[in-house]
Amino acid sequence: VSGSADGAARRLLVTGADTFWGGRVAQAFEADPDVEVVVGMGAHDPSVPLERTDFVRVSDHSYSTVHRIVLATGVDTIVHTGVMVDSTLGSNRLHDVNVIGTLNLLAAAGAAGSTVKALVVKSSGLVYGATSRDPYAFTETMTRATPARTPIERSLLEAEALVRDFAQDNPDVTVSVLRFANVLGADLSTPLSRNLSRPMCPSLFGYDPLLQFVEQGDVVRALIHAVRIAKPGTFNVGAPGRLPLSEVAAICGTRLVPLPPWQAGLFSVPFTRLGAFDLPPELIPLLRYGRGMDTKRFRETGFDYRFSSVEATHAFARAIRLRKGVGHPAENYQYQEDLERFLRHANSVATRAGEPSRPF
């Protein structure tokens, strides 16, 4: 990540640092010598080791709390990864996290005394929906063909509307919104990836939709790239190519279970209760119509994908086979606040060669 426009080192705030994406983005920034400060904010303990990130656990994302953090740390860039894109993680929290949380963050970023000059927001292709009237590939200027029907889609659309209003009201802040395709990765768990890793995967009778993916590592790289280039606007992020669900299932070694297309949610209840697969309401239209996004705008900023959609699928399938052969890797990391404080600030902790000395 290059320094700021005036040559100063970057100071960054990562929201959702306790989540899968926030933790990995914070780790990536920690390794960048041009980043002076990384602040992580989350409601729960981090799930990955953070060596240089100053993590603050907040029980709420109220304006007063976020405002105090932004002013006290003097951050110039915010990476908002805390937006929920999976309703199975808690549908009752969607509005509070996606809408109210985003509103409070934007209010703090635009308040008097704020030093924020750049904002990167992680969003989702869910904002486009999936219908029979969709174009082959959505561009960023297109809108969805029908109103949002699921709570998660409505919350994402509301959050993006708030971000657009903020960008108009704060022209001195560079605002970038990244809409990601469905993500596949060895470490990531989503309704679709869980289904593909199980013996049975739901489908809709008579439909074989084309799917576009993005590999988990490319997601982190895209967010870092967006911070580095500081280009305003909305960008679709999805790997090149699309492939039919039947091919995806064959690569992953799962058997498709066709459900009636007009009562899929009802007929899936016995399967979901048994844990055979997940079928949240936002996944049903995707299994019928698929979704494609035109990613030319983001590629023109200089971003290169390491995986195509097909390559991401094969890499995910290899991870599934490895997991079935050797089991899940042991989760060794557990955040301990007192230990983290000691390791960062105690005089008795030696500084390793090549590391900056701690200010005492």
Task: Mark where each language-model region is.
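Short alpha-helix in the Rossmann-fold core of NAD(P)-dependent oxidoreductases
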Residues: 95-102, 106, 120-123, 155-156, ...
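N-terminal Rossmann NAD(P)H-binding glycine-rich loop of SDR-like oxidoreductase domains
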Residues: 7-32
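Mid/C-terminal beta-alpha module of Rossmann-like enzyme folds, strongest
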Residues: 220-281, 295, 308, 315-317, ...
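Active-site Tyr-X1-5-Lys
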Residues: 148-176
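NAD(P)-dependent short-chain dehydrogenase/reductase
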Residues: 166-216
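Conserved Rossmann-fold NAD(P)-dependent oxidoreductase catalytic core, especially the SDR/UDP-sugar
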Residues: 104-151
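NAD(P)H-binding glycine-rich loop region in Rossmannoid oxidoreductase-like domains
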Residues: 58-100, 130
